């Protein structure tokens, strides 16, 4: 029935998770339409680096459209097509290649039968599921297969990567950092000197690759995009400095991204410049251990951890005072890494550093810090990341079917995914047959959308890489809110950069159809109560829960209510879930059930092959009542599943 | 899974997979102040095991530790790194005295698999070692050193770096061989003491015995009284007793059990003077009191190093009730002046007979206790209990302690789950309870209440949460009826 049942991975559907993603800084968000006053540059406050007219001017209407659609340096390449022979075909054949990739993806997908959810969900679906329940039978399992590539949360994030990483470190051995100084202090000294030198003489990659055009490039102003928050080593008096440093230290979670040469790429708090020597030490530690054919993972101290993730050509470091395990922090860092890939593609990223090892990547990413900031914030509050799944907007099945069908009919040749979302909740998702979206990619899209309000201003057409789908190339995403005053956002993912008008037309047709069938009113109504209350379940001591159906990659949870009203309390609750999750999914000692009794609440985690359930109760509840609540809750979810989940995902 | 890696893969399935347990890679002690300038790095190193390592390699490894510590001070000046995890190993850092750093590097367990083309593929198991366990082992290394050598600083005052290096070399060279890293577990974290439960009368008898003895032998400063490896009375400070207890029960006593079992008819007591028949003898000090040339060498120990800094001699005297039985009581006595042979004879004559009598009283108690607990059939659970306030520990998981291994009766994975729960407990001060079901379907319960911790492993695979809870309640009622645990 399930594993190996279907001839292909029927369950891999792409879904649209409405997760907030910050808009990427380096992309130009602008309406491609040139006529009728629609031509407006949707700037999101990011720095738009580009050639030709200054970034703040409207684009002249005669301008070739492709230029507006790709990151600046990519565009350069297309414009000066002859400049770099090896790159030109790359860009030109992008669409073709993407198609090939999909082909490949499709066939590889078939090999992996084990994850395939059953095709035969028609079998009877148990009322109150048992641990032995097969995937595809649990509440929330799709009737016709899933929409996602199967993510088993953490495990998924790491497996393939580790292989890649070791390959990288191998390379490192041959061409990596020069002979090792004997003393670490020496190394860090060297690095801090190095980074000072580099800031002095830094030359942009573009400048080097496009001599003669360098004067056209605007130097991205350093701090645009977000306010420079509390630089640790600035201050007028010593006391201030002390205070600032102390405040900087006490942040719950620091995140640093740097290049292998020790150049800062991103720092969550404090300016990269001020931290360049700290980052120099980080990269020195990494390469020191790699010289021994070893790899640094984490440092543990009282009250905090430092976690290192190495994804050549980048090094990512988190310093966290949260209760999260090193595993989970590494997972968050991977999200940051994917976030950077989604702006640049993996291919470009490695190309840049192959060309110039000490390239200052901030030139390309400047302005995108906000997207990363937003992602970090989201991960601290939204359980979607922890669950490795998407949450659906609660919606009557009939309405959802109408929406899905309308979305399905509004197709275009180049479309791969059509996703309707509302405030990081998925409303509907239609995918091309045999193409599946990975939850991580969806989360990144959600983050992109939620990190910028500029998408509300019209239609945006932006290149975006979906790193889990294909880290080598860009898709082109059409992003628009359906009506200015609602949270309904439509995301159309296309393979063809030139296809803006066709895709934009899909949006128009979709809206027309919705109106014709009257579904837009029902949708509007549903948006008024985007979350349900846990009281609807009817279990008095139950305060909150997370339930994930593994085969569909979807999860559901009620609104977080009292006593978790403040932000701190909400993060604390998520912290408790994270704690249970990390114990249940511990790589070497996984657990099936956890019952935790704390001073403020009791929690229960239950992980089976088909679903995961996390419940939070009042501290007064007994274990007996908790056990009976499980069954009651599972029955309720089964009863409500067609409202809480997307059971019949569609393909074009 | 397969329990503890049969000697590096000579097992029946060695063909496919070999397992190697965690191993001590290196152990070093350094002081960054001793070689602040370039070219002097070697001076920082006070002790390095294995000593054969090339000089530059030593300097590099010390440099890495310094860098890690310095780096973490960026984020927390007063709480630098405790451990470093890498793919291949874990390093544990401890700064027991200002600027003196002890570092222990433990290799992760390895599984060696045969790849398809026949080449061995090595896989490091990165999540197997528990930080708290090995950090505790490292701290214990220092405590043990300090017990027999005093502080690092004292050695520096007495004879400079040279003397310190000598002492470190002499002590750790042997001590490191007694670390059995693959069998370290939760009990190493607690470093607790097993107490012998006794009725009031017997307890008072022991106390008055100790008082009288200390009075008549005035060089005696502190006395501890043990029975069957369990502590009954101690005059020492808790922390000093804790490490002394560890030494006695895992090193000194076991070393003396084996020869006794081998040669029961040893002539030590053959020519006892007088008619006071007893089986007392010295475990430290002279072997034969009647030999006028017998050497009276007692190990020195250092206690109260934080304030009065006392340098004492450790006298361990032991008596057996019947020569053939295991039951034994030991008095460990600390004296301030160097005890002479004459003193030893006096002690033997005073303590020997009385200790024998006391031992028989205690033995009676022991049998009563045994009957009470033995009346139940084999319980469905095993437990470990620890009280942070008096260091009392009790384990039915561990079958026996030997100098080399502590044998447990449960799967190592379950022991690690206990360790995980313990480290979760440390993160908050509040009372907590955790019940988990492992993949093997065993239930594991951890309770923390009022600085006491209880861990239970239940062997009822088909039980549900409620039944498990009932079972643990029952256990608490019978074993810990006066201790409140969160329900």
Swiss-Prot record, chain A:
GO terms for biological process: protein secretion; protein targeting to vacuole; vesicle-mediated transport. Signal peptide: none annotated. InterPro entries: FUZ/MON1/HPS1_longin_1, FUZ/MON1/HPS1_longin_2, FUZ/MON1/HPS1_longin_3, Mon1. Keywords: Guanine-nucleotide releasing factor, Phosphoprotein. It holds the Pfam family Fuz_longin_3. The keyword Phosphoprotein applies. The modification Phosphoserine is found at residues 128, 153, 188. GO terms for molecular function: guanyl-nucleotide exchange factor activity. The modification Phosphothreonine is found at residue 158. The keyword Phosphoprotein applies. One of its GO terms (cellular component) is cytosol. Residues 102-141, 158-185, 211-245 are annotated as: Disordered. Plays an important role in membrane trafficking through the secretory apparatus. Not involved in endocytic trafficking to lysosomes. Acts in concert with CCZ1, as a guanine exchange factor (GEF) for RAB7, promotes the exchange of GDP to GTP, converting it from an inactive GDP-bound form into an active GTP-bound form. Interacts with CCZ1. Found in a complex with RMC1, CCZ1, MON1A and MON1B. The MON1A-CCZ1B complex interacts with RIMOC1. The MON1A-CCZ1B complex interacts with RAB7A and this interaction is enhanced in the presence of RIMOC1. Belongs to the MON1/SAND family. This is Vacuolar fusion protein MON1 homolog A. It comes from Homo sapiens.
């Amino acid at each position: 029935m399930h594993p190996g049942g279907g001839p292909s991975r029927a369950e891999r559907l792409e879904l649209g998770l409405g997760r907030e993603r910050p808009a990427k800084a380096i992309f130009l968000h602008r309406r491609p339409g040139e006529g009728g006053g629609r031509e407006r540059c949707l700037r999101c406050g990011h720095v738009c680096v580009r050639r030709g007219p200054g970034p703040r001017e409207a684009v002249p209407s005669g301008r070739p459209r492709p230029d507006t659609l790709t990151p600046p340096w990519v565009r350069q390449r297309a414009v000066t097509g002859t400049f770099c022979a090896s790159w030109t075909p790359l860009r030109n054949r992008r669409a073709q290649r993407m198609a090939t990739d999909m082909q490949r993806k499709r066939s590889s997908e078939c090999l992996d039968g084990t994850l395939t959810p059953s095709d035969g969900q028609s079998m009877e679906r148990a009322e109150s599921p048992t641990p032995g329940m097969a995937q595809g039978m649990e509440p929330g399992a799709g009737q016709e297969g899933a929409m996602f590539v199967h993510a088993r949360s953490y495990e998924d994030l790491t497996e393939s990567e580790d292989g890649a990483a070791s390959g990288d470190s191998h390379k490192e051995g041959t061409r990596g950092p020069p002979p090792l100084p004997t003393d670490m202090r020496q190394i860090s000294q060297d690095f801090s000197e190095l980074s000072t030198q580099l800031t002095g003489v830094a030359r942009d990659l573009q400048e080097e690759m496009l001599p003669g055009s360098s004067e056209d490039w605007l130097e991205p102003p350093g701090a645009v995009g977000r306010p420079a928050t509390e630089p640790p080593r600035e201050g007028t008096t010593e006391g201030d400095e002390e205070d600032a440093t102390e405040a900087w230290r006490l942040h719950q979670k620091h995140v640093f991204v740097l290049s292998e040469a020790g150049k800062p790429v991103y720092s969550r708090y404090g300016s990269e410049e001020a931290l360049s020597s700290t980052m120099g030490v980080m990269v020195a530690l990494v390469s020191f251990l790699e010289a021994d054919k070893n790899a640094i993972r984490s440092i543990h101290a009282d009250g905090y951890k430092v976690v290192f993730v190495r994804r050549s050509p980048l090094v990512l470091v988190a310093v966290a005072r949260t209760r999260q395990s090193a595993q989970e922090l590494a997972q968050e860092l991977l999200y940051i890494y994917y976030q950077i890939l989604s702006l640049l593609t993996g291919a470009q990223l490695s190309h840049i550093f192959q060309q110039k090892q000490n390239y200052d990547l901030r030139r390309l990413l400047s302005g995108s810090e906000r997207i990363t900031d937003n992602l970090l914030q989201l991960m601290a509050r939204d359980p979607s990341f922890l669950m490795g799944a998407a949450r659906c907007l609660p919606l009557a099945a009939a309405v959802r079917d109408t929406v899905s069908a309308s979305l399905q009919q509004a197709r275009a040749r180049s479309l791969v995914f059509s996703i309707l979302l509302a405030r990081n909740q998925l409303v509907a998702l239609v995918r091309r047959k045999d193409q599946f979206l990975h939850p991580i990619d969806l989360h990144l899209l959600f983050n992109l959308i939620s990190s910028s309000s500029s998408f509300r201003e019209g239609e945006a057409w932006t290149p975006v890489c979906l790193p889990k789908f294909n880290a080598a190339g860009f898709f082109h995403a059409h992003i628009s809110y359906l009506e200015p005053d609602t949270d309904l956002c439509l995301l159309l993912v296309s393979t063809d950069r030139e296809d803006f008008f066709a895709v934009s037309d899909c949006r128009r047709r979709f809206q027309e159809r919705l109106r014709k069938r009257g579904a837009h009113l029902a949708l509007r109504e549903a948006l008024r109560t985007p979350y349900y209350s846990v009281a609807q379940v009817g279990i008095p001591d139950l305060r909150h829960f997370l339930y994930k159906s593994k085969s569909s990659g979807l999860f559901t949870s009620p609104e977080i209510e009292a006593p978790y009203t403040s932000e701190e309390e909400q993060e604390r609750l998520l912290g408790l879930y994270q704690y249970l999750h990390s114990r249940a999914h511990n790589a070497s000692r996984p657990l099936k059930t956890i019952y935790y009794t704390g001073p403020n609440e009791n929690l229960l985690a239950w992980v089976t092959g088909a679903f995961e359930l996390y419940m939070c109760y009042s501290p007064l509840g007994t274990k007996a009542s908790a056990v009976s609540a499980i069954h009651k809750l599972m029955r309720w979810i089964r009863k409500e599943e067609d409202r809480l989940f997307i059971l019949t995902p569609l393909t074009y | 899974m397969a329990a503890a890696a049969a000697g590096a893969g000579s097992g029946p399935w060695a063909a496919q997979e070999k397992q190697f347990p965690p191993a001590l890679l290196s152990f070093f002690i350094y002081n960054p102040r001793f070689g602040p300038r370039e070219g002097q790095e070697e001076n920082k190193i006070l002790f390095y095991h294995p000593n054969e390592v090339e000089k530059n390699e030593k300097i590099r490894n010390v440099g890495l530790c310094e860098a890690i510590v310095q780096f973490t001070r960026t984020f927390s000046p007063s709480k630098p790194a405790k451990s470093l995890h890498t793919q291949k190993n874990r390093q544990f850092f401890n700064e027991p005295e200002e600027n003196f750093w002890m570092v222990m590097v433990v290799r992760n367990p390895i599984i060696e698999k045969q790849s398809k083309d026949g080449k061995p593929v090595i896989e490091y198991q990165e999540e197997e070692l528990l930080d708290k366990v090995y950090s505790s082992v490292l701290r214990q290394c220092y405590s043990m050193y300090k017990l027999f050598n005093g502080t690092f600083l004292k050695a520096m005052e007495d004879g400079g770096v040279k003397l310190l290096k000598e002492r470190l070399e002499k002590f750790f060279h042997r001590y490191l061989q007694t670390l059995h890293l693959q069998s370290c577990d939760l009990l190493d974290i607690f470093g607790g003491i097993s107490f012998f439960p006794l009725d009031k009368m017997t307890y008072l008898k022991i106390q008055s015995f100790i008082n009288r003895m200390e009075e008549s032998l005035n060089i005696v400063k502190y006395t501890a009284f043990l029975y069957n490896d369990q502590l009954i009375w101690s005059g020492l400070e808790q922390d000093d007793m804790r490490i002394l207890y560890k030494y006695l029960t895992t090193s000194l006593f076991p070393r003396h059990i084996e020869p006794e079992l081998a040669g029961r008819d040893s002539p030590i007591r053959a020519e006892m003077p007088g008619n006071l028949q007893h089986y007392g003898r010295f475990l430290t000090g002279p072997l034969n009191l009647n030999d006028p040339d017998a050497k009276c060498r007692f190990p020195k120990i250092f206690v109260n190093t934080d304030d009065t800094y006392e340098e004492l001699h450790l006298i361990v005297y032991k008596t057996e009730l019947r020569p053939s039985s295991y039951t034994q009581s030991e008095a460990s006595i600390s004296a301030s002046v160097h005890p002479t042979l004459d003193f030893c004879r006096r002690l033997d004559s005073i303590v020997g007979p009385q200790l024998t009598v006391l031992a028989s009283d205690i033995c009676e108690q022991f049998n009563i206790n045994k009957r009470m607990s033995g009346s139940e059939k084999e319980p469905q659970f095993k437990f470990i209990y620890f009280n942070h306030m008096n260091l009392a520990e009790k384990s039915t998981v561990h079958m026996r302690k030997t100098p080399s291994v502590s044998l447990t009766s449960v799967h190592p994975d379950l022991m690690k789950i206990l360790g995980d729960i313990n480290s979760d407990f440390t993160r908050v001060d509040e009372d907590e309870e955790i019940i988990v079901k492992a993949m093997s379907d065993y239930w594991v319960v951890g309770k923390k209440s009022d600085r006491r911790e209880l861990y239970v492993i239940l062997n009822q695979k088909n039980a549900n949460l409620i039944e498990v809870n009932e079972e643990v309640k029952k256990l608490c009622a019978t074993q810990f009826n006066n201790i409140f645990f969160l329900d």
